[in-house]
C-alpha cells in the first residue's frame, strides 16, 4: 500500500539535488533581510511506487503480488512507469518494456495508468502539506520539497513534522 511507502526526508541536501535546493531557497528568501542567518528547515517528500500504490488501494486483490503500471497491457506494448516493491525485487525496473518485464517476472500484473486518479491523490498529499507550510515546491506528482522553516515553532522540529505528515498520510489513506 501507499501507506508503507511514503517517505519524508528531513533536511535533504544530497549533492546532486543541491542546485535545486539552492534555487528554491534563493527564490523564496528574497524578502529576508540581507545578512540575516536563518537556518532553513526543508523536507523532501517522495511517495515511492506511487502509481502502483494507488492502484493497490483500489484493488486489494493485488496485495502480495507483483504489480506494474504502464503502457497498454491489452496491446502488450509500452513501458513500466512504476512497479511495486515485489515486482522490483523480481527485477522489474522503471522504463523497462512491458514484454521484458513479463520475461523477468512472469506472474507480473499489468494495469494501464489512470493519471486522473494519481493526480487526485497527489492533490490530497499537497492538501496535507499545506497545513504545515505554503512553501511547497512540487517535483512531479509524487514528490515535493516543503520549506517548514516558519512552522517549526508551532509544529515542532523538522523531524517531528516529517513524522507527523507521514503518520497522517498513512492514517488518511487507510480510510479510503
Task: Locate predicted features.
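Gly/Gly-Pro- and Ser/Thr-rich, intrinsically disordered tail segments characteristic of DNA damage-repair
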Residues: 9-176
Amino acid at each position: 500500500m501507499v501507506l508503507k511507502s511514503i517517505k519524508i526526508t528531513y533536511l535533504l541536501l544530497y549533492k546532486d539535488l543541491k542546485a535545486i535546493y539552492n534555487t528554491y531557497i534563493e527564490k523564496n528568501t528574497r524578502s529576508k533581510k540581507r545578512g540575516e542567518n536563518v537556518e532553513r528547515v526543508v523536507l523532501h517528500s517522495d511517495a515511492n511506487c506511487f502509481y502502483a500504490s494507488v492502484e493497490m488501494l483500489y484493488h486489494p486483490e493485488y496485495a502480495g503480488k507483483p504489480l506494474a503500471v504502464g503502457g497498454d497491457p491489452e496491446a502488450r506494448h509500452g513501458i513500466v512507469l512504476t512497479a511495486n516493491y515485489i515486482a522490483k525485487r523480481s527485477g522489474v525496473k522503471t522504463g523497462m518494456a512491458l514484454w521484458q518485464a513479463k520475461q523477468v517476472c512472469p506472474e507480473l500484473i499489468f494495469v494501464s495508468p489512470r493519471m486522473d486518479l494519481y493526480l487526485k491523490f497527489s492533490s490530497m498529499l499537497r492538501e496535507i502539506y499545506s497545513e504545515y507550510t505554503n512553501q511547497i515546491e512540487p517535483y512531479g506528482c509524487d514528490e515535493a520539497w516543503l520549506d517548514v522553516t516558519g512552522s517549526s515553532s508551532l509544529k515542532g522540529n523538522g523531524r517531528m513534522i516529517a513524522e507527523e505528515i507521514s503518520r497522517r498520510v498513512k492514517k488518511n489513506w487507510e480510510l479510503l
